Structure formats: structure tokens, C-alpha cells
Amino acid sequence: MTNYHVTLEAAWLVRDVETADDAIGVAISEAGKRLNPKKLDFVEVDVGTTYCPACSEPFGSVFIAANTALVGLVLEMKVFDAESDEHASRIAKSVIGKALTDVPLNVVDVEEFD
């Protein structure tokens, strides 16, 4: 059995915000509020990065229209004693998905560690 570090991305909708910084703060706070009661404080939450297709400059994954933001969050957790990287990603999606119901999740990266 092997240990894995699994990175997921989530699409988080935030209403009634005017700036990207406000949207990021609200999204991270709301995600934390939903993870902590489930004892998932070991899940790291951060804003994702998107790259400009024209100039390749990185920027925060936030899009705002009509005071509503779509924030791309990155969720990271360690999975211990998984049979494979596919198994580790299923475990991570299951654990995080139970706390963040109705939030789209996608596996971004799975890395083995000792």
C-alpha cells in the first residue's frame, strides 16, 4: 500500500461580491466552514491558478459577472495506504465530496510520497 498526495479542483459560486479578493475570501471561508464540522481540517484549501491564453501570465481563478463570482479552489489532502493513484483519487473525491455536496470536483494531480 502506498501513500498519495491528491489535489482536486472545485468550482465555487459566490454571490453578491464586487471584487475578486472578496470572492476568494468568501469562497475559502465557506469551504472551510463546510469541511471543519466533518473533521476535515486536514484538507488544504487555496485559490487555483489560471494562465492567460494570450500572455501565459498566471492569475487567480476568479471570474465575476453581475456581482456573482465563480472561484476555482484547489483542495489538497494526503491519502494513506491506497492501492493505486486511481484508488487514492477516488478516496479523496469521496471524503471531500461528502462535505462539499453539490460542488463540482475534479482530480488535478496525484503524487506518491513516502
UniProtKB/Swiss-Prot annotation:
S-S pairs: none
Family matches, as InterPro entries: UPF0212 (IPR007564)
Annotated Pfam families: DUF555
Segments crossing the lipid bilayer: none
Protein family: Belongs to the UPF0212 family.
Name listed for the protein in its UniProt record: UPF0212 protein Mbur_0968
